UniProtKB/Swiss-Prot annotation:
The lineage of its organism: Viruses, Riboviria, Orthornavirae, Negarnaviricota, Polyploviricotina. This is Neuraminidase. It is a single-pass type II membrane protein. It comes from the Viruses. Keywords: Calcium, Disulfide bond, Glycoprotein, Glycosidase, Host cell membrane, Host membrane, Hydrolase, Membrane, Metal-binding, Signal-anchor, Transmembrane, Transmembrane helix, Virion. Catalyzes the removal of terminal sialic acid residues from viral and cellular glycoconjugates. Cleaves off the terminal sialic acids on the glycosylated HA during virus budding to facilitate virus release. Additionally helps virus spread through the circulation by further removing sialic acids from the cell surface. These cleavages prevent self-aggregation and ensure the efficient spread of the progeny virus from cell to cell. Otherwise, infection would be limited to one round of replication. The active site is at 151 (proton donor/acceptor), 402 (nucleophile). Belongs to the glycosyl hydrolase 34 family. One of its GO terms (cellular component) is membrane. Residues 11-33 are annotated as: Involved in apical transport and lipid raft association. It is found in: Virion membrane; Host apical cell membrane. Inhibited by the neuraminidase inhibitors zanamivir (Relenza) and oseltamivir (Tamiflu). These drugs interfere with the release of progeny virus from infected cells and are effective against all influenza strains. Resistance to neuraminidase inhibitors is quite rare. It comes from Influenza A virus (strain A/USA:Phila/1935 H1N1).
Length: 469
């Protein structure tokens, strides 16, 4: 092959390669255009899964629901249809209590970023249940956890996270600056109540769907405080009880009716021989029942029941199965205060079923240890101490603490009745243990009309932590 032929051959090969490359590029452009057209067209149709995957460095909220997997948030499509939670259903018939959640916050917090908290409670909308809690503006096993045994400080805040999850900066939503709080959902939005400020000038800030709607200032200038559990909603109105005045004597107690975050009515209870603090409230057949803490002089629990016009009745649980702590041994009850060991107390709850009552209480009569549920078939109206069911949920040797009620509406469960549930705070740290901090985890149970079991679901953390040594 002479030099001219070589040049012609090489040139021909280069030309063929160039043409092939051009064809491939044109094909690539056509492929990209077709793919883009398909994606653009699909945006006008609802997919079967209707799921978005959004990847960011930080957690991103879409419809306030996410699952954090590394740095990828898989965001499920969620029905955000609003309904009105009527609260007109009666409580579901139950035979016992099934474990619903356990967050193990203290155990996880020995190595993970978990908030120092107290006063956790649960509340449910028609779509989800959330754990609310009062942080101390600090993490477990960190220097700022020092001294968090204190109840009221400017660093405390009401936050919430999905039920059953340990409360951390990565899954929690800020709700309100508060050292006393309540929250509930009316079917259309979240109402939060956060109390903060100095003891003699505290102010309750009401928010509806995160927007401030009203404030309530301390009217007795003696530590305004509220439920530390969920408020109760009936037919679009939500109801809460606040206390202002001495913790060891007669105080002032008010019921507030709230619609979309605005107070529409309030009354002060006429209860000269009663003491109402930290009430646990629930709706039942269109009315609201609250079972509270008597920190003044009762070892049984006071109650107040009211309708949507705030017409109310008051009393004490009559049963000789006493529900507070400290308390005497079970014996003869009273439909007024039982004065034996009546001073001090702990937040708690009960559920009324006609003349009967489910009583939640610590197993210990003198300390916050253990927890049990007692069914007294005549305990709402009779003073004997005979009961027919006892279910253990925390052993006598394990720490407990506050407890409170919450309900799951038919709009959430699909049942034709209101499901009763409760949570138990498992307090760890100061003042009973050798740590620099005080915090808690929580467990919760819901009533079922089927088989249940006795067991102990304790906090389980091994103390002290590194920061305590």
């Amino acid at each position: 092959m002479n030099p001219n032929q070589k040049i012609i051959t090489i040139g021909s090969i280069c030309m063929v390669v160039g043409i092939i490359s051009l064809i491939l590029q044109i094909g690539n452009i056509i492929s990209i255009w077709i793919s883009h057209s398909i994606q653009t067209g699909s945006q006008n149709h609802t997919g079967i899964c209707n799921q978005s995957i959004i990847t960011y460095k930080n957690s991103t909220w879409v419809n306030q629901t996410y699952v954090n997997i590394s740095n990828t948030n898989v965001v499920a499509g969620q029905d955000t249809t609003s309904v009105i939670l009527t609260g007109n259903s009666s409580l579901c018939p139950i035979r016992g209590w099934a474990i619903y959640s356990k967050d193990n916050g203290i155990r996880i917090g020995s190595k993970g970023d978990v908030f120092v908290i107290r006063e956790p409670f649960i509340s449910c909308s028609h779509l989800e249940c959330r754990t609310f809690f009062l942080t101390q503006g600090a993490l477990l096993n960190d220097k700022h956890s020092n001294g968090t045994v204190k109840d009221r400080s400017p660093y405390r805040a009401l936050m919430s996270c999905p039920v059953g999850e340990a409360p951390s900066p990565y899954n929690s939503r800020f709700e309100s600056v508060a050292w006393s709080a309540s929250a509930c959902h009316d079917g259309m939005g979240w109402l939060t109540i956060g109390i903060s400020g100095p003891d003699n000038e505290a102010v309750a800030v009401l928010k509806y769907n995160g927007i401030i709607t009203e404030t309530i200032k301390s009217w007795r200038k003696k530590i305004l405080r509220t439920q530390e559990s969920e408020c109760a909603c009936v037919n679009g109105s939500c109801f809460t009880i606040m206390t202002d005045g001495p913790s060891d004597g007669l105080a002032s107690y008010k019921i507030f009716k709230i619609e979309k975050g605005k107070v529409t009515k309030s009354i002060e209870l006429n209860a000269p021989n009663s003491h109402y603090e930290e009430c646990s409230c629930y709706p039942d057949t269109g009315k609201v029942m609250c079972v509270c803490r008597d920190n003044w002089h009762g070892s049984n629990r006071p109650w107040v029941s009211f309708d949507q016009n705030l017409d109310y009745q008051i009393g004490y649980i009559c049963s000789g199965v006493f529900g507070d702590n400290p308390r005497p041994k079970d014996g003869t009850g009273s439909c007024g205060p039982v004065y034996v060991d009546g001073a001090n107390g702990v937040k708690g709850f009960s559920y009324r079923y006609g003349n009967g009552v489910w009583i939640g209480r610590t197993k210990s009569t003198s300390s916050r240890h253990g927890f049990e549920m007692i069914w007294d078939p005549n305990g709402w109206t009779e003073t004997d101490s005979k009961f027919s069911v006892r279910q253990d949920v925390v052993a006598m040797t394990d720490w407990s603490g506050y407890s409170g009620s919450f309900v799951q509406h038919p709009e959430l469960t699909g049942l034709d009745c209101m499901r009763p549930c409760f949570w138990v705070e498992l307090i760890r740290g100061q003042p009973k243990e050798k740590t620099i901090w005080t915090s808690g985890s929580s467990i919760s149970f819901c009533g079922v009309n089927s088989d249940t079991v006795d067991w102990s679901w304790p906090d389980g953390a091994e103390l002290p932590f590194t920061i305590d040594k």
